[in-house]
Amino acid sequence: MEEELVVISKSIVNPRSLKKPTSVKKIQLTPWDLSRLRFGYLQRGLLFHKIEVKQLQASLSVALDRFYPLAGRLVKLKNDDDTVSFFISCDGSGVEFVHAVAKNIELSDVLELSGSVPGFFASFFPATGIKNYHGVSRSLLMVQVTEMKDGVFIGFGYNSTVADATSIWKFINAWSEICSKDSSGSQTFQRRLHLKGWFFDEIDYPIHIPDPETKPTSYVTTPTNLQEKMFHVTKENVLKLDAKANDEADQKISSIQAVLAYIWRSMVKHSGMSREEETHCRLPINMRQRLNPPLEEECFGNVSQTGIATVTVGELLDHGLGWAAMQINNMELSQTDEKAKAFAENWVKNIKIPVSVGSKDLVVTNSHRFDVYCNDFGWGKPIAARAGPPYLNGRLVVFKGIGEASLDFQACLLPQVVEKLVKDAEFNEYVSIV
């Protein structure tokens, strides 16, 4: 189906007040940002019945007035010690905007998305194959609107040195509000954008690092024969797993921790890994309120740290759901100001810029806390939310479900793991596989 997508136009959308100087010209990158330079742009998207492309572009220009870092570019400076430094220039260079048509693809093709990747769906996203360090010449946010036979998909890719998922969804929320209500004059929109600033007092900036464009010394091999499936957990089953985990645990477990632990154990059970091997659950942690002093909840930027729960396969399978959920809970509780700053100080002393993460991990991205279904651009609420490349074995993208308190997960797994999960009666008791 990929060849059936036709690009109608490519353009640059600049902030509406391009000639008006922004309050901040330069944003320094923290160790959290710099460590992601070799990662690909993160890509998300929303499915609609109808959208007007010109109105989308016009409202995007207005939204970029407030969220001006997204319209900037990375700047790379060469240092005398054979290192480089990066910062974000808030120069209003603009956002790449693609208008495409795929008239033979229907809403059902996306809603029932299942099977091998990349498949046709990868072409619905604008930043496939682009790394964060490419932000020196490519826009830090990219948007693609694809008109289908009976619907429209808005795909966007973003550079995770400029924003984390919390910030990018706040931007999408604001953009949709502007588009639907022309609310650019509202008090909320007129407030100054709070940036994260510099909160690593013991670290001088700009940080000198090896050039991320040079060939890395080691690679994490990513399987190419991956499949995607949507996992759906109803409100009733979320509550059942929550109750089961809390009955078995000696500490308070949240619903999302219980569900993630259940999926983690099930995936590892069918992974073929030996009992002695380590498995990890990687989870993004919003650090805004965990830092000391805490940052504004609304502050814009990448203020996300990856928390990692580590156990052996044997430990995970020998213990119950409650124990697995406690490992995730303890990991989250350990994400403190002291730990964050210790990580940053150690990273500067021993700089590592990974290409990817381990292929035997459960890599959780996004969050059920993001209200993706409130993003009505003026033609109705989204039908569905989806994620695009990069594809990674063990990737689990979390979305709030359409049904009250339900959860959706876009899983990327090896085909043999998918096959076993489909046949696993215990797994299917709580999780519906689409």
UniProtKB/Swiss-Prot annotation:
GO terms for biological process: defense response; regulation of defense response to bacterium; regulation of defense response to fungus; response to bacterium; response to jasmonic acid; salicylic acid biosynthetic process. InterPro entries: CAT-like_dom_sf, Sec_Metabolite_Acyltrans. GO terms for molecular function: acyltransferase activity. Disruption phenotype: Hypersusceptiblity to both virulent and avirulent strains of the bacterial pathogen P.syringae associated with impaired pathogen-mediated induction of salicylic acid (SA) and reduced pathogenesis-related (PR) genes induction. These phenotypes are reversed by SA treatment. In the cv. No-0 but not the cv. Columbia background, defects in SA accumulation or signaling enhances resistance to necrotrophic pathogens such as the fungi B.cinerea and A.brassicicola, leading to small necrotic spots and minor chlorosis, as well as reduced fungal growth. Its EC number is 2.3.1.-. Induction: By pathogenic bacteria (e.g. P.syringae) and jasmonic acid (MeJA). The keyword Repeat does not apply. The active site is at D376 (proton acceptor). The keyword rRNA processing does not apply. It is an enzyme of class 2 (transferase). Keywords: Acyltransferase, Plant defense, Transferase. It comes from the Eukaryota. Required for pathogen-induced salicylic acid (SA) accumulation and SA-mediated resistance to virulent and avirulent pathogens (e.g. P.syringae). Belongs to the plant acyltransferase family. This is Protein ENHANCED PSEUDOMONAS SUSCEPTIBILITY 1. The lineage of its organism: Eukaryota, Viridiplantae, Streptophyta, Embryophyta, Tracheophyta. The gene is EPS1.
